[in-house]
Amino acid sequence: MTHSCRLSVAPMLDWTDRHCRYFHRLMTKETLLYTEMITTGAIIHGKGDFLAYNQEEHPVALQLGGSNPQDLATCAKLAAERGYDEVNLNVGCPSDRVQNGRFGACLMAEPQLVADCVAAMKEVVDIPVTVKTRIGIDDQDSYEFLTDFVSIVSEKGGCEQFTIHARKAWLSGLSPKENREIPPLDYPRAYQLKKDFSHLTIAINGGVKSLEEAKEHLQHLDGVMIGREAYQSPYLLASVDQELFGSQSPIKKRRQIVEEMYPYIEQQLANGAYLGHMTRHMLGLFQNMPGARQWRRHISENAHKPGSGIEVLQQALAKIPQELDV
């Protein structure tokens, strides 16, 4: 494997698009970045280039939603040809829309099908094929249910890496948002899974809010995936390389990161992109700092205006007190 899963940013629908990933990559060279989940149907039949990304994003993984082995193999092959570093199968998303398409968390109940999907993808690509799943679904939440799933998908499908969202999913009655918050976290179950499947690479996801917490999990597991916290307080990514990968590079200041976004933004604007689609990912950069609210407000109120450019960010940056060396 050419990249590490030691720390990754979770695939998050409507959030981890290519603009977001470019922004995150400015802060960390080592963190593995994931696309939003993209369905096989969108890639095979949709209009538009759903696989577009920037070369600077590497290492970057494509997360696929689907349950047809042949379609998944087709998409995995396209991803590998485009240079993605990993393909990940979504077996964790609980939304009704996803279930109706017969993919996501409901696939936990069909481990042989998941194994077939993984095997079909592995047959056509040399890059890692991984699975992101939950610890259970509905009332099927025993440890045995999880170990049966991992056994079948690893032995029959050849999957060597699993990211475990340490909550079960309720397939009805809870919204996707509630499914990320209401089912209790069970980290020890993921730790036990690593003990029982020591030959597999096991990463954890769910509720991780700091690099200190990530370090604690890394005492027991191979990797940690951070979701909402990395999006809402993205500056935590700025010290990942130093804290978790031993980098000697200086940690970038927030102002430097904003300024490093300017050339990218100008290039994207020239290609017809909309400023707000890029700046929305940057709103949390000054989280909990003096001037943070003014920074967010100025961007939110101005980025959507016709003809807006990097001057919106320059003006927003001026709202942060100059004496702060941030």
Swiss-Prot record:
Cofactor(s) it depends on: FMN
Molecular-function annotations in GO: flavin adenine dinucleotide binding; FMN binding; tRNA binding; tRNA-dihydrouridine20 synthase activity; tRNA-dihydrouridine20a synthase activity
Phylogenetic placement of the source organism: Bacteria, Pseudomonadati, Pseudomonadota, Gammaproteobacteria, Vibrionales
InterPro entries in alphabetical order: Aldolase_TIM (IPR013785), DUS-like_FMN-bd (IPR035587), DUS_fam (IPR001269), DusA (IPR004653), tRNA_hU_synthase_CS (IPR018517)
UniProt name for this protein: tRNA-dihydrouridine(20/20a) synthase
Residues carrying the site annotation Interacts with tRNA: N90, K177, R180, R293, R296
Organism field: Vibrio vulnificus (strain CMCP6)
Top-level taxonomic group: Bacteria
Gene3D superfamilies given in the database record: 1.20.120.1460, Aldolase class I (3.20.20.70)
Signal peptide range: none
Record keywords, A-Z: Flavoprotein, FMN, NADP, Oxidoreductase, RNA-binding, tRNA processing, tRNA-binding
Gene: dusA
Binding site for FMN: P11, M12, L13, Q63, K132, H165, N205, G206, G207, G227, R228
Active site annotation, chain numbering: C93
SUPFAM superfamilies the UniProt entry points to: FMN-linked oxidoreductases
EC number: 1.3.1.-, 1.3.1.91
Function: Catalyzes the synthesis of 5,6-dihydrouridine (D), a modified base found in the D-loop of most tRNAs, via the reduction of the C5-C6 double bond in target uridines. Specifically modifies U20 and U20a in tRNAs.
Reaction catalysis annotation: 5,6-dihydrouridine(20) in tRNA + NADP(+) = uridine(20) in tRNA + NADPH + H(+); 5,6-dihydrouridine(20) in tRNA + NAD(+) = uridine(20) in tRNA + NADH + H(+); 5,6-dihydrouridine(20a) in tRNA + NADP(+) = uridine(20a) in tRNA + NADPH + H(+); 5,6-dihydrouridine(20a) in tRNA + NAD(+) = uridine(20a) in tRNA + NADH + H(+)
NCBIfam families assigned: PRK11815.1, yjbN
